[in-house]
Swiss-Prot record:
CDD domains: SPL-RING_NSE2. Component of the SMC5-SMC6 complex which consists at least of SMC5, SMC6, NSMCE2, NSMCE1, NSMCE4A or EID3 and NSMCE3. GO terms for molecular function: SUMO ligase activity; SUMO transferase activity; ubiquitin-protein transferase activity; zinc ion binding. This is E3 SUMO-protein ligase NSE2. The gene is Nsmce2. Its EC number is 2.3.2.-. It is found in: Nucleus; Chromosome, Telomere; Nucleus, PML body. E3 SUMO-protein ligase component of the SMC5-SMC6 complex, a complex involved in DNA double-strand break repair by homologous recombination. Is not be required for the stability of the complex. The complex may promote sister chromatid homologous recombination by recruiting the SMC1-SMC3 cohesin complex to double-strand breaks. Acts as an E3 ligase mediating SUMO attachment to various proteins such as SMC6L1 and TSNAX, the shelterin complex subunits TERF1, TERF2, TINF2 and TERF2IP, RAD51AP1, and maybe the cohesin components RAD21 and STAG2. Its main location: nucleus. It comes from Rattus norvegicus.
């Protein structure tokens, strides 16, 4: 990734990193754009499953998500390389200002050389995308060995009856409208109910336990919760079909 820096000589006590830090701020803004792009790809992918729409491999949402994950990794590496270089120069205080651009590029390439597919397992949005896509396909009866055959083998009656108990919030005992999943244990709850429960516990300086009977997760935090888009769509699909049958 290209970068620019001044190579003027002089004592580090006169070096101003304000320009570099401003550029870093801009890069972090771009990170939010990548995050939004991943959200869009995830939403489109779930739409395709829900509407039973086939697309060519050229427009695969999986491929698009991988590209976004690669961009996110590359940008994170570059930001890390710049921050590491700045910290190093501040600590070492060399008599002459080194070639900052060269130092950043060396650190960046060193990080890039360690790239592997396993990195994607650390990308929360990528992992969430794969999990939600898998869950929605499961709700629609699409198995992994049938993914390339579009919606072949889909059984709509199975969609209606499958895992309806998963639609019930363990706190309210009502069907969920805005389900969120606990990243730590995998259980789901109605967002408003679980947020209220966690806040209530924390205000009393107590730990919030997962309300699902038998769950061993005893220290829930707000950061553990993520929207369960796949389950929300499955619930809506079930309710639409139930409404059609009653008309």
């Amino acid at each position: 990734m290209p970068g620019r820096s001044s190579t003027n000589s002089g004592s580090t006590r006169y070096i101003s990193f304000s320009g570099v830090e401003s550029a870093l701020s801009s890069l972090k803004t771009f990170q939010s754009c990548i995050s939004s792009g991943m959200d869009t790809v995830s939403s489109v992918a779930l739409d395709l499953v829900e509407t039973q729409t086939e697309v060519s491999s050229e427009y695969s949402m999986d491929k698009a998500m991988v590209e976004f994950a690669k961009m996110d990794r590359e940008l994170n590496h570059y930001v890390k390389a710049v921050q590491s270089t700045i910290n190093h120069v501040k600590e070492e205080r060399p008599e002459k200002v080194p070639d900052l651009k060269l130092l950043v590029e060396k650190k960046f390439l060193a990080l890039q050389d360690k790239n592997s597919d396993a990195d994607f397992k650390e990308n929360e949005k990528f992992v969430q995308f794969k999990q939600q896509l898998r869950e929605l396909k499961k709700q629609y009866g699409i198995h992994a060995d049938r993914e390339n055959d579009g919606i072949e083998g889909m059984d709509e009656d199975m969609i209606v009856t499958q895992s309806q108990t998963n639609f019930i919030c363990p706190i309210t005992q009502l069907e969920m409208k805005k389900p969120v999943k606990n990243k730590m244990c995998g259980h789901t709850y109605e967002e408003e109910a679980i947020v209220r429960m966690i806040e209530s516990k924390h205000k009393r300086k107590k730990k919030a336990c997962c309300p699902k009977i038998g769950c061993s997760h005893t220290d829930m935090r707000m950061s553990d919760l993520i929207p369960d888009e796949a389950l929300r769509r499955a619930i809506e699909s079930h309710n639409k079909k139930k409404k059609r049958h009653s008309e």
